[in-house]
Amino acid sequence: MKSETERIETYAEFWDFYVAEHAQPLTRYLHFIGTMLSLVLLVWIVRSGNWLYSPLCLVVGYAFAWFAHFFVEHNKPATFKYPFWSFVSDYKMVFFMLTGKMNAEVERVKASNI
């Protein structure tokens, strides 16, 4: 895995970095809650036509995630350096959590960094 100062070049490399940065279960659960709440809010906005509330989707999603990084994981969110890949990875992680694959991903990444 690359150091914090080196630039990650591929999404596969980034995914391993992302998983390592989300090693604590509470971090993953807080991301899950924020992502799901932002999706529910987005559905409400689309259905109601209240587009002025759109920025709240980002606020809700990122508030839970950033809280987890600063107070649970004690690291800096990857969003600051890799915004697009981080956004995509949040949804990939939620999908893996819903399908029961995320814990295995964490273990795989931990084992590869020994």
List each language-model region with its residue ranges.
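Hydrophobic alpha-helical transmembrane segments
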Residues: 54-59
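Transmembrane alpha-helical segments that form the membrane-embedded catalytic/substrate-channel core
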Residues: 60-73
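Membrane-proximal soluble regions of multi-pass membrane proteins
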Residues: 2-17, 74-114
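Structural signal for membrane-spanning alpha-helices in multi-pass inner-membrane proteins
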Residues: 42-45, 68, 97
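Transmembrane helix interruption/hinge and helix-loop junction motifs
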Residues: 45-53
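Membrane interfacial helix-start motif at the N-side
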Residues: 11-32
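Core segments of transmembrane alpha-helices
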Residues: 30-43
